[in-house]
Amino acid sequence: MTDRVTVGNLRVSPVLYDFINNEALPGTDIDPDTFWSGVDKIVADLTPKNQDLLARRDHLQAQIDKWHRARVIGGFEAEDYKQFLTEIGYLEPEPADFSVTTSGVDDEITTTAGPQLVVPILNARFALNAANARWGSLYDALYGTDVISDEDGAEAGSSYNKRRGDKVIAYARRFLDGAAPLASGSWTDITGLRIDDGAVSATLDDGGSVALADPQQFVGYHGEPDAPTAVLLANNGLHIEILIDADSPIGSTDKAGIKDVVLESAITTIMDFEDSVAAVDADDKVLAYRNWLGLNRGDLAEEVSKGGKTFTRVLNSDRTYRAPDGETELTLPGRSLLFVRNVGHLMTNDAIVVDDNGADGAEVPEGIQDALFTSLIGIHGLRSAGDDDTKNGPLLNSRTGSIYIVKPKMHGPDEVAFTCELFSRVEDVLGLPQNTIKVGIMDEERRTTLNLKACIKAAADRVVFINTGFLDRTGDEIHTSMEAGPMIRKGAMKSTDWIAAYENQNVDIGLETGLSGKAQIGKGMWAMTDLMADMVEQKIGQPKAGATTAWVPSPTAATLHAMHYHQVDVFAVQSELAGKRRSTLDQLLTIPLATELAWAPEEIREEVDNNCQSILGYVVRWIDAGVGCSKVPDIHDVALMEDRATLRISSQLLANWLRHGVITEEDVKTSLRRMAAVVDEQNAADPDFRPMASDPDNSIAFQAAQELILDGAAQPSGYTEPILHRRRREYKAASNVG
């Protein structure tokens, strides 16, 4: 790129430079020259530290590889392994007990347990939908998913099916019986609602009336006391809105005139710059930053076509109600509280390069760029200091003046400390008070898991979130022990002892370090986007395990998962778990090696085909369409939400089997060619899809998928980004894609 803007020792892409100066900086009172001078200084000071941390990863991995290669035949003793990891500094001393001191954190994080959406920032429509998913229709979520069965003529067709609707109403009434029970009887029996002397009164079939079992659950309403149009209830810190309109199509079929039950749903949302996006150059990054800016300024809008009509989707306003006394006004947030997930420490991006005597030098670490620019933009979502009004508009993000950044893929406490140093330097450049920028720690790398308490201590005054990520964590488990021997099959990983120990330890150490009431303790994604009945049955296990939040793939899933937090008082669970350590270091260090290679040839082929199909189905959309998060049908046509984490585990498992002779390179190539035809068929209805099977040698996507497996053992920590970014850039250049 020859037309870059020179800023000190940096050369900046003009599309980024213009965006920052003309769109992001106005309204922040930050002088452009001062800002860019600060960027230059941070890059100069912190890039060498970033590089040193990556070099340490490689050095530790080389030592571990060498140790395992010397023992791959005879095996090893657990104590010897532990001692070795301690000697090389992989295992660090656990710090003495402490409690985090994070302050200025919004209630959505500290005192509210509920679902968390993760959404790709490159898609403005998805981002708007997610931000607006703070409230969701339970009726719609039930009617449109398999939570309500099709039995007895209750199929969901092109027009409203009253039989299905009646099932939805009955389900919602049962939910209300559990979340906000009446003093006697059931919500199924009511024929109306009214407000009497500041309390809810439900009229019953027999003409009598009944109050709530706990009158304090009534917190607001719309309309008149004798004919409310909405009744607002609260349970376990979450709100339930009962909408009443006997003249509406649904309300007219309901003896109480209830037309919907609306649940407070996605309490928080992560706007993702990382695993769910394909951002490989300055143009991609600026699109992402611009969407983040629109969310923080409150002016992001997107034209949406639905049902033959086009409308503009914008961010929802806050919701107001009359308090039970009929006089006071109650205001509740209308939008999800937003985190932003930056990229990790590994990748660089050509949006900014070092000036090499007037030529383009090395690309600047992308994580440093993200920290600077997403934090700058985050200022637009903060309340002005000492002022009840907002600085740039009515749609706040944080009401306490914090910017929330999730930092992924950190390996150990030194990398967490580096992130905190970076955030501190960014605060200085932006003129923000220290610790304005909070950090969410993804516990998804093995060295972080094994040193989790030290990682939290390194961010004790910033941490607002720890979260397990089974897929990335398994990918790192495989890669770290790549030389130890062949691993078990992918599907068996979830039932291993180390996974259970990993999930338990995250909660236990979070509680031990004082996160309850100060920070989220989170758990992972439900990936089967169409199997909502299974999700409703199974995902309740996460709040029961002490997680104050867990990831969901859609607004609909957020509304359904919200029911679990009415059924489980997570903070009570945390009180019961406090003071326990349910896992041991030995369990966490148990490598998921196959104890004997007793797989039949058809089992091996099934595993290879499954993973090859998954890899191809995701990679082809990443490379050819620039889509980083896809609902990809698996080999059995079950739709799965795929991102780079799923790609990492699939490619690393096959790389491991290839390394140890379970499969051959020819097995991989043959399966990829066979599965390419399957993926082509699954995408046949997409007019923009480029088939792979007919000419795999000239399909960049196919070649990327093959490279991810065949060269998987050599990838840093098993990450897929280096190959994906290079291949996506290759595709964009070959296809003249901007």
Curated annotation (Swiss-Prot):
Pathway of action: Carbohydrate metabolism; glyoxylate cycle; (S)-malate from isocitrate: step 2/2
Record field: catalytic activity: glyoxylate + acetyl-CoA + H2O = (S)-malate + CoA + H(+)
Compartmental location: Cytoplasm
Residues that coordinate or bind Mg(2+): E444, D472
Assigned EC number: 2.3.3.9
Location of Cysteine sulfenic acid (-SOH) modifications: C629
GO molecular function per UniProt: magnesium ion binding; malate synthase activity
Tagged with keyword Protein transport: no
GO biological process, one term: glyoxylate cycle
Active site: residue positions: R341, D643
Reported cofactor(s): Mg(2+)
Source species, domain of life: Bacteria
One cellular-component annotation, GO: cytosol
Cross-referenced PANTHER family: MALATE SYNTHASE G
Assembly notes: Monomer.
Protein family according to the UniProt entry: Belongs to the malate synthase family. GlcB subfamily.
Descriptive protein name: Malate synthase G
Species this chain originates from: Mycolicibacterium gilvum (strain PYR-GCK)
